[in-house]
Amino acid sequence: MAYKIVVDSGHGGEDPGAVYPGRQEKEDTLRLALEVGRLLEAGGQDVVYTRTTDVYQTPFEKAQIANREEADYFISIHRNSSPRQNQYQGVETLIYDKSGIKLKMAEAINGALEEVGFRNLGVKERPGLVVLRRTNMPALLVEAGFINNDQDNQLFDEKFTEIAGAISEAILGTLCLLYTSD
């Protein structure tokens, strides 16, 4: 069964997101979101992108895109940042609350990224985030490593294909479990 999945690239346009010498979150997220989306499409899913170029949309606009498309799932790709360089490392996935399919999918994504080599910082509730609160479908925000951590950046660059594969396979695996349990 094909699901409609909105894949969102965090930030964009005049909003670079977190920055670190030589990189901007908006660029890393766009590159990763496009590859995750491509892999989801190859897995038979219907993918809608919030952006495919360097443009800015408010979080409200991103949620509206997903709602207008009547998507089944919303996946937002981001990079994390900490107050000090190399202070933290790892991946975490944010969800509105720890319930339902979004929790299973978030845990699967984090576990798959841990296998690639990231530290698993767990699944966190963030009910105040617009893209998690204003979407009418299960929504996740994946923080794919810290942009101001040298080890996370090395992993992001050297294992980019594996990272995109891990995220997409975790999503597809969760959807497969859901479909077979119906």
Description of each model-found segment:
Residues Y3-K4, E27-S181:
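Active-site-proximal helix/loop segments of hydrolytic enzymes
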Residues A2-Y20, I75:
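Catalytic-core environment of secreted peptidases
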Residues G17-R31:
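Glycine- and acidic-residue-enriched helix-capping/strand-helix junction motifs
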